[in-house]
Every structure is written in structure tokens, then in C-alpha cells.
A protein has these predicted regions:
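Generic recognition of long tandem-repeat/solenoid scaffolds
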Residues: 44, 89-93, 102
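Short, internal acidic amphipathic alpha-helical interface segments
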Residues: 52-96
């Protein structure tokens, strides 16, 4: 199966707000990434003092979380307002190591998603998946 050439990845630095263990406001930068070769996923890399932490989530989950509550289990998102009344997307991440609840400005998240949609429109993700290569990888184990 011949695939069209893959567009370059999309990345964007987005500031995230949360509270530290003492309830003080904390802002740090996260890298949001999208690779058209893995068209269903977005990657978040939290740049924190203890080292980078990577999370993957469905691009559709991130898009849904802008307008309505979405997700269950490890990642939940919902629209919210920050303390200044600005639209944000709240994101709740759970892992065996702990929990992190952050807020990102909705406009930043939407800008990132719009850039990914320009590369691979919603609904066209399957056009960017090489099924033959995927089967070969699965069989190679």
C-alpha cells in the first residue's frame, strides 16, 4: 500500500498552570506534539525539575475536552475558567506515581489542534496509517 509523503511533525510550547503541594500557583512549560505518522495521538511532554514526563492521548480527546468533559481513567479533560475568568482546558492526569491537574489556555490548545488539523484533517487519520507496515511490526513482535 503506497502512502502519501508524511508532513513534518507539529510542536508547540504551551504554559500550564497548577498548584504545588502547598497550594501555591505554579506555571511550567509543556511541549505539545503531533506526528502525522501516528495520526490519532498527541504527545505532551511536561518539562519539570525532576525531568521530562511524557504522556500520550487521543487527539480527539483533546479536541473534545475544549468544549465538554471528556476522558476517563488516566486522563480526564473539561472546559473551565481560570481565576481571571479566561477560558482554559483543565487536564487531570493519573498514574501509579501520582496525579497532576493542570490548566492550559483554551486558545493555546485550539491553536495547536488547528495546526494538526491542517496537516491531517479530522476523519482523515486512517489515510496516514500504513497498514502493511503496522502488520509487519506486530508480526515481528
Amino acid at each position: 500500500m503506497s502512502q502519501p509523503p508524511t508532513a513534518p511533525p507539529v510542536t508547540q510550547e504551551i504554559p500550564l498552570q497548577c498548584e504545588d503541594e502547598l497550594g501555591r500557583p505554579l506555571t511550567f512549560v509543556s511541549s505539545f506534539g503531533y506526528d502525522p505518522g501516528d495520526p490519532y495521538a498527541v504527545w505532551l511532554t511536561f518539562h519539570i525539575p525532576g525531568g521530562d514526563v511524557h504522556w500520550a492521548m487521543a487527539r480527539s480527546l483533546l479536541a473534545t475536552g475544549i468544549d465538554e468533559p471528556a476522558g476517563e481513567g488516566d486522563i480526564c479533560l473539561w472546559p473551565n475558567l481560570d481565576s481571571d475568568g479566561r477560558a482554559v482546558v483543565s487536564m487531570d492526569f493519573h498514574s501509579p506515581e501520582g496525579r497532576l491537574v493542570v490548566e492550559a489556555r483554551t486558545r493555546d490548545v485550539y491553536q495547536f489542534l488547528a495546526r494538526t488539523w491542517a496537516v491531517v484533517p479530522p476523519g482523515a487519520e486512517a489515510d496516514n496509517v500504513d497498514l502493511d507496515e503496522l502488520v509487519d511490526e506486530l508480526l515481528a513482535g
